C-alpha cells in the first residue's frame, strides 16, 4: 500500500503514453481551434508537464468556457458527497481533444432539418421525433415447411 499522497500519486500507468506513441506530439495537437461551448475530452499527455490536469479530470468530458493562447478553460461536473459541483479548470491544449459525444446528436439535427425542408417543399408534415422500436409483427409457423430439431440433455457418464 503506497503512503505518499502527492499531486501525481498512483499515475504510473494513467499518464503513460501508449505503445509506439512516445516522443514528439503531432502538430495537429497545437493547431486545433477550440471555441466557446465546444465539448472536449480531457486526456493528460504524460510527456507535457505544463498545464497538466489533476488525475481526477483524466478521461472526463467538459465544455469550453474560456480560451487563452496556450490553454483552454473547461467546466466539468464533479461529484462531492451528495452534490454535483461545476468545476472550472484551465488545461493546456496538449491535454485536450474534441469530444465525439455530440456527434450523433448533431448528425440527427442535420438530418431532421433536411427532412423538414423537403417536407415543406412537398407541402407535408414530417415527424422527426425518435420513437422506441415497435414489437415485431406476429407470424404463423407452417409445420409442413419447418424442420424440427429434438433437443435432449447429454447423458452423464462418470469418467474415472
Curated annotation (Swiss-Prot):
Transmembrane segments: none annotated. It comes from the Eukaryota. GO terms for cellular component: cytosolic large ribosomal subunit; extracellular matrix. GO terms for biological process: response to bacterium; translation. Keywords: Ribonucleoprotein, Ribosomal protein. SUPFAM superfamilies: Translation proteins SH3-like domain. The keyword Heme does not apply. It holds the Pfam family Ribosomal_L21e. One of its GO terms (molecular function) is structural constituent of ribosome. The keyword Transferase does not apply. Belongs to the eukaryotic ribosomal protein eL21 family. This is Large ribosomal subunit protein eL21.
Amino acid at each position: 500500500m503506497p503512503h505518499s499522497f502527492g499531486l501525481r500519486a498512483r499515475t504510473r500507468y494513467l499518464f503513460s503514453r501508449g505503445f509506439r506513441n512516445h516522443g514528439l506530439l503531432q502538430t495537429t495537437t497545437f493547431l486545433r481551434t477550440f471555441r466557446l461551448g465546444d465539448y472536449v475530452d480531457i486526456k493528460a499527455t504524460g510527456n507535457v508537464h505544463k498545464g497538466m490536469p489533476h488525475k481526477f479530470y483524466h478521461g472526463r468530458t467538459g465544455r469550453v468556457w474560456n480560451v487563452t493562447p496556450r490553454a483552454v478553460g473547461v467546466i466539468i461536473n464533479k461529484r462531492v458527497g451528495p452534490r454535483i459541483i461545476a468545476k472550472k479548470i484551465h488545461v493546456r491544449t496538449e491535454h485536450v481533444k474534441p469530444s465525439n459525444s455530440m456527434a450523433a446528436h448533431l448528425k440527427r439535427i442535420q438530418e431532421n432539418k433536411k427532412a423538414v425542408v423537403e417536407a415543406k417543399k412537398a407541402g407535408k408534415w414530417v415527424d422527426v421525433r425518435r420513437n422506441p422500436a415497435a414489437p415485431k409483427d406476429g407470424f404463423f409457423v407452417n409445420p409442413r415447411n419447418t424442420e424440427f430439431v429434438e433437443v435432449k440433455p447429454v447423458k452423464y457418464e462418470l469418467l474415472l
